[in-house]
Amino acid sequence: MNTWWEMTEYPELGLAAMYRIIKKCGGERVSEEAADQLRRILEEIATKVSDQAVDLSIHAGRKTIKAEDIQLAAKNLLNLIH
């Protein structure tokens, strides 16, 4: 599993989407550093959820990752945070 500092220089998520998310939440002005930090955090979360979803599908004897694998993996990750 990669951590945010081990990811490639070509992020999977776009910076423009990070600006939109922050602005939708009420941010009037958003620094590039803030948008980039949100992108790094969300990519790390997505990587952790995806890793666990892959494990769940393998445990179920499937090669296909299903929506319920993602949902369960996200729920498990959120339960660890709280």
How does the language model describe each region?
Residues 1-82:
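Intrinsically disordered, low-complexity terminal regions
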